[in-house]
Amino acid sequence: MSGIESTEEPCDSMTESQSLSPLEPEERQTRKDSGLQSQSLTKRHFAFSPHRLITSISRHTSPHKPRPKSESRVPVPKLHSLPPQRLASPERDKPSIEGISKSFVSFLTAASVYAGFQDLEGEDQQVSPDDVSAGESEDQQADESSDEQEDDDQDDRTFYATDPSPTELTINENTPLPEPEPPRRTLRKARSRFEFSVVKRLSENENDQLAQKRAIALSNKLKRTFDISDTDVFISDYPCWLMGDVLLQGHLYITKHHILFFAFLPKKQGSISKSGALTTKSYPSLREHRKWAVLRNNTFSVYSNSTDLYFPLLVIDLRTALRAEILQSSSTKQNPSKPVWIRIITESRTHWFLADNLASARSWVSSLKKHIFASRNKGDQVAIKIPLQNVVDLELTSVIGVTKNLRIKVIESADTFAIDDYFLMFFSRGEKAVEDIKKVIHDAGMEISEGTSTESEDEQGVDNNLLKSKIELLKKSPSMVQTSSKSNVPVIRMDEPADDFSQEQESAESSKPVSDDEIVSADDNQELEEKQPQDNLANAEKENHDKVSRANSRRTWSTRSLVQGLTAITQGWMSPSPMAHFDEKYAVLRGEEDSYFVKDAEQRKAATERFRKHFSLTDGEKLIATYHAYLVKGIPAYGKIYLGSNEMCFRSTLPGTGTIMILPFSDIENVNKEKGFRFGYSGLVVVIHGHEELFFEFASDQARDDCEFMLLKQMDMFKKGSTDSSPPNASEGSSDESCNLAESNTSLASARLRMFENRIHDAIGLDVPIIIEEHPLTKTKVRPLKSYRFTLLTIGSRGDVQPYIALGKALMKEGHQVRIVTHAEFEPWIKKHGIRFASIAGDPSELMALMVTHPTINYNFIKEAKSKFRSWIDDLLVTSWKACQDTDILIESPSSICGIHIAEKLQIPYFRAFTMPWTRTRAYPHAFMVPDQKLGGAYNYMTHVAFENGYWRGTAHQVNKWRVETLGLPKTSLAEMKQNNVPFLYNVSPTVFPPSVDFAEWVKVTGYWFLDESETYQPPEVLTKFIEQARKDGKKVVYIGFGSIVVSKPSELTQAVVDAVLEADVRCILNKGWSDRLGTKTEIEVVLPPEIYNAGSVPHDWLFPQIDAAVHHGGSGTTGASLRFGVPTIIKPFFGDQKFYAGRVEDLGCGVSLKDLNYKSLARALKEVTTNTRIIEKAKLVGARIRSETGVQTAIETIYNEMEYARSLSISKVKQVSVVKSDEEFDDDKDEEVEGSWLLV
């Protein structure tokens, strides 16, 4: 079946069939001669058929055996990973699609499954067979009590279910409904026969106005979507799933003349579905390069880093993609951290990317498959229309329980006579659906063949006779199957599946001629377009890659492309019209004839199509104007500026260059005219939010001025449209966070679904992405069914504990059990939030005092730490092991030392989470080894390696002794721990800490985990009056507090603060925190003036929105809180990560870093941050970005996505217990050799 490419499978006796005409009558096309069609379209069809899925499994599980031409059935692969009882027919050694679906559905419906959709199997009990809904049901808001109910008999491995809201529902009175089409004014139009049949079927009571209104809305929707005749009759509808490369939730509608399938696809306009680092190889050097990949609606873009997202190195239009797939060797599963190649095959070429591991590769490919599928269907919906007279065979097979698999074999059209297969999965009432279809076929006087699992020669003859009769019928009354697919795929009949990649790729390369408008690839771009693994691919693949690379190389550097580039330059220099207008409304605004307006409608249409093609834009994007100019970014790049309805784009036209810019209007702040860098040129500066300005040079003032006018006019229209569509009374902060919270909830649901897909893949070896229908009136909610027991382990200060409380509360909302393990003094605070608590050894104030005394890691620090904290480390290891019992998932701050060993013993998923740079990277130095000036990537990477070795050597003796005596594990080493392979969560904003391209896929910068406590906080009346009086006096209000820092002379620090506040003429809210914690004084030793109010501890989310600046020590949590609310920040770092964040605040331009703290430096900094408008505006911009992030939801999403990978790491480690009780084995003076590590002295 070719109508929806990713949900089709060819018939048994015939091969690939033609894609069906779209539903719009004007777009219908009849293909008379299938043999003359393009082979690239053939491959596009094959790329999305379930037959390719089956044959690909066959290639990986058993040797390929050609099928004899006389055999009528498609060869079905043997799934060695499935137990015999999971197959549809145990006696057959080749499972059919039913066998695969049986294994798949077992995870959805059985009581002893890993995961499933709980409500689906129970639909028969909730809805009678005669009760038929139209698929447009109420928006379910499940009762909280029902969310907490679980089946006591269910196996504890079950961890997924949808909310208990069946697919077949009724609409309540509050549910919005599409309005029916209004009647004609001239004559009251009676209901058509089709409308009457829908109303009669769906409303038992004639007086039920709501049901009738719903029925009319459904009939109008079906008529508009499927072009249903008024004389047709509605029979019934059923919820079902369409099977193919994806499993799509939707509805089956049966009428007197047609079988209809319809589903709403998820809508994510402009949002990023997935992003991360991937490795590419350049040609011909085969050097590896790390790039940043971003997956959006219809595009897969590659950038040089995660911050410069306006200049893609490569943009793949997924509307031209055939498929995405993984290439893995037999050793991949044995080593979960081994890199794996993936490839995206398009109509013109193949793109190779190296993922960090198999889990990452599967995540990328699954997301790509969903996007490719969605991009090939019109209007965010999937629609299939099958005339009943085209149906040849119905085959219903049982899967598990009431779950049925329906195979519909149809003749595509009277022109091609190709046979397509549609596979539908019913979780209830599958027999009733088949009965309805058979009844309407029988009533129409037609006949079909009832397929079985095996066929004899006589039965095959009957099928042939039936096929001939069907063809004769179609010749007399032509009809064709129609789908919402954007492309028409020809029918090519083959005896063997077209799965030879070499033949496919050669055809793809030769099928598309070089276009005059094709973007010429730069060196960096070219290296991305053809990737070839060296070790794990077959020789045939390598040879094919060489052919493709040579073909692309010839294309890129051909004489034709060179001449085209030179011609473009010459025309740009010499053309009397260096600009062109394409929108009629601007010509009217000028009040006179626009000499630059392109009057030919066909030329305007062709230019718009080229514009969309160049930048892979949506079909709704309009071209407004174009200009020839230079982009001055390093070396000036000559090219063309395109102004669209939503973006400003640039494309270089020089031969050998491939600079592309896609800049949304929403990110442009202003446009200014300037003088050009070169004599005779005019400049235009585009000011971008949070990004360096872009400078363009034009050959004339006229072109520059026209570009400025058009750009400002289009920006005003864009912003006006955005303002009109936004809520009128929403505050800036609340609207930012609420909108992004809704988006994060969608991402979280996708992560739950991905976690479900991972468990299915690990059990049955299939990787079929699942798409949940985004119905406008009802929503299928995927929620965790199993309650996992999370343990969050950390040591340190209040700032180290607070993020875990925020994460713990969110995990509890997901239905999990959470326990925080940390120092005893935080127990009341943690329990106040309803989180379980367990204590470990250690006094955090002593740790703070040691760190303040030794701001950097040096010999004296190691010596003092070893003498003071040796016994504490022993106690920490023992108490942590006891506290982490009965744990399913462990999340630990890596400074706690012991978590990775506990996870190895318990064989559970293990994650690390921290607030400062801790993983190896060239982008940032280690937080404890930050230099006074930037020393480059080599130094940064060295600091991480040196710290890892030093930190391990300082604790290795005690850790290994504890492993052997307490855990029963053998000794380990830095290399054997493989801590750089552990999934890592940075609870820091990507705005403050942009993820580096050399971060592994399992290293995620999630965003801050904020704990909002302002709702329960009652501020003292004195504090509120202090703030009000400062506002009346026209004075700036600043916050000064140093949190958990312990200082030896607190009175001197207080006096410096007092003098600085008076000097700067501001009002101060003071919070000394732990600054005098180790002292004996209980009251402030310095008398505070009226300009300073000693507030003590105040929730940041209550205080910071009301102040003008903040002064603090630069801890991650406090820095995030001040930046979150757009407050200019002054940081005086004392130790550790504080120096790192002080530098980041200065780099962002939203604050000041103090090297020395005295009243003069502090006063000067206070004046700077309260009066410098640049710092104030920059802080507001950074705050808006941080408020748009949802760190906690992103963290949970990452946990779900990486859970199976984290589990595989723990399981893959050594399990053999080596018990050594002799104390001689642990000699303190013995220098232990650590394999694979080194220490820089």
UniProtKB/Swiss-Prot annotation:
Q: Which GO terms describe its molecular function?
A: sterol 3-beta-glucosyltransferase activity
Which ranges form a coiled coil? none
Has keyword Glycosyltransferase? yes
Pfam families for the chain: EryCIII-like_C, Glyco_transf_28, GRAM, PH
List every stretch annotated Disordered. Answer: 1-97, 124-189, 499-556, 720-741
Keyword terms: Autophagy, Cytoplasm, Glycosyltransferase, Lipid biosynthesis, Lipid metabolism, Membrane, Protein transport, Repeat, Steroid biosynthesis, Steroid metabolism, Sterol biosynthesis, Sterol metabolism, Transferase, Transport
Topology in membrane? Peripheral membrane protein
The UniProt record lists the keyword Protein transport: yes
Q: Which family does it belong to?
A: Belongs to the glycosyltransferase 28 family.
What is the name attached to this protein's record? Sterol 3-beta-glucosyltransferase
Gene behind this protein: ATG26
